[in-house]
């Protein structure tokens, strides 16, 4: 990336696949150095304009499965669809893959018959289900909670089968009620993304297109979803992606969409202002709820929109996660006067 910046004399260069966070950090750091060197805001804006050449996409592309969103869930869906024999196209509006998973801790809760007994931890799927329901004040859908908890350890095994390595110890993530949180051996959720990217690079039946934003989900006369209309951010051209077997919307949440979160804030935090002073722990450029809104436009039902999670470890103002290397069981929260308030 550094070589490209020097060659093009621009920050508007592509990152390196498999090193998305490092590429983004390097370009940000160079930009900060330019600011310190008194480069004007206007010149800096010009330096950030993209200088890469992009071949225009066809007006229409056909595949079996179209996935909107190249974050953790979208890439996991792409790998699973590929393993099932489908041809897949993933559409990602940013110039890098990973979305909010890239900036997560990567915790995955699962009752583990291998790791937990070695640590003297008693657990079961039934206990996981019970604690998940109680942790949600018993407003969760029991069938979905059961599906989540029963599928949690198989998800760990599946991730391991494609190359993810987990630590031998399990912890207690923030908000968890039991010591069953699995963490990648290499810290952060970016570990998952690197494995997904490696798998996709080795399987030509999965095509990833970045810098392209889905604008509309399309239906036929019978109401069946048949494709996606998307606009390439760099060329400004539209492409119709026809999906023979279906479209998966995996665009994540809406934590960075201040207007939307204020509109739906009718739940436990309705007495509080979730305006701009509250940051977003997710990757802000992607956490806009675009997939939810597109789904609603074609008749999809939505549930739980008011069930907004407020995280205690976000940096005030920005919401970026603070790297607090302690268990959720042993933190003490104090205010600026040193008084405990939790």
Segments and roles (model prediction):
Residues 54-73, 89:
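Beta1/beta-strand and adjacent pyrophosphate-binding region of the FAD-binding site
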Residues 45-62, 338:
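A short, basic/flexible loop-to-alpha-helix module at the beginning of a structural domain
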Residues 234-237, 242-314:
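Glycine-rich loop(s) and the adjacent beta-strand/alpha-helix scaffold that form part
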Residues 187-245, 292, 298:
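Helical element adjacent to the flavin cofactor pocket in flavoenzyme catalytic cores
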Residues 1-49:
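Active-site- and interface-proximal helix/loop "cap" or "latch" segments in soluble metabolic
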Residues 308-342:
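FAD cofactor-binding and catalytic pocket of flavoenzymes
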Residues 96, 102-207, 211-216, 261-263, ...:
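Conserved N-terminal/central alpha/beta ligand/cofactor-binding core
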Residues 83-103:
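Glycine-rich FAD pyrophosphate-binding loop
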């Amino acid at each position: 990336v550094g070589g490209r910046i020097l060659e093009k004399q621009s920050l508007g260069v592509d990152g390196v696949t498999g090193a998305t966070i490092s590429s983004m950090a390097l370009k940000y750091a160079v930009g900060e150095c330019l600011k310190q060197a008194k480069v004007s805001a206007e010149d800096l804006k010009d330096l950030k304009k993209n200088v890469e050449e992009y071949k225009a996409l066809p007006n229409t592309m056909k595949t079996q499965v179209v996935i909107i969103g190249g974050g953790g869930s979208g890439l996991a869906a792409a790998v699973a669809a590929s393993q099932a024999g489908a041809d897949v196209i993933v559409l990602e509006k940013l110039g890098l893959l990973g979305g909010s998973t890239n900036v997560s801790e990567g915790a995955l809760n699962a009752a583990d018959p291998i790791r937990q007994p070695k640590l003297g931890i008693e657990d079961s799927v039934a206990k996981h289900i019970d604690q998940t329901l109680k942790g949600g004040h018993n407003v969760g859908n029991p069938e979905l909670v059961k599906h989540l908890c029963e599928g949690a350890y198989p998800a760990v095994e599946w991730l391991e089968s494609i190359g993810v390595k987990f630590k031998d110890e399990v912890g207690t993530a923030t908000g968890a009620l039991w010591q069953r949180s699995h963490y990648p051996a290499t810290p952060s959720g970016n570990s998952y993304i690197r494995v997904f990217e490696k798998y996709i690079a080795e399987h030509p039946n999965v095509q990833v297109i970045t810098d392209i934003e889905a604008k509309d989900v399309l239906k036929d006369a019978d109401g069946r979803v048949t494709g996606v209309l998307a606009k390439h951010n760099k060329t400004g051209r539209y492409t119709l992606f026809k999906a023979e077997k279906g479209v998966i919307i995996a665009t994540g949440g809406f934590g960075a969409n201040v207007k939307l979160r204020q509109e739906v804030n009718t739940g436990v935090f309705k007495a509080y202002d979730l305006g701009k002073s509250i940051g977003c722990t997710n990757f802000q450029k992607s956490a806009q709820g675009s997939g939810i809104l597109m789904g609603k436009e074609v008749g999809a039902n939505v549930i739980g929109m008011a069930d907004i999670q407020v995280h205690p470890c976000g940096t005030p103002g920005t919401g970026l996660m603070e790297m607090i290397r302690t268990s959720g069981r042993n933190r003490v929260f104090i205010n600026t006067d040193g008084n405990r308030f939790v």
